[in-house]
């Protein structure tokens, strides 16, 4: 059965993802290292991992597989999930695939190097609003439908 995993620390689309999971009657797992209230929705579970670098990422990567969907902005986690057979959607609605994750990781690494070399370099830092939420919902619907055919 398809499960929706959310890298929940600082995820801006938890409520939108919950609406989709509820409509499709599929389980959703919020994974974080604290700070979230247990959900009232019986389809949504909360996994609190120990404090530490990448603990939530490690848990998600260990539990997701073919037919599952992961929502994250973390590109190394996305890469691990894709290799495990899961599908990945970013909160802005971008769908990550085995074909586009390599260039995305390379760009991420390049930007880290630029920021390290130039402390005054400013990132794009765009806002997150209705358009991004709408794009996320469209992408999540499409990816969840495909995942259900697999799972």
From Swiss-Prot:
It holds the Pfam family DUF188. It comes from the Bacteria. Disulfide bonds: none annotated. Belongs to the UPF0178 family. HAMAP family: UPF0178. This is UPF0178 protein Pden_1915. It comes from Paracoccus denitrificans (strain Pd 1222).
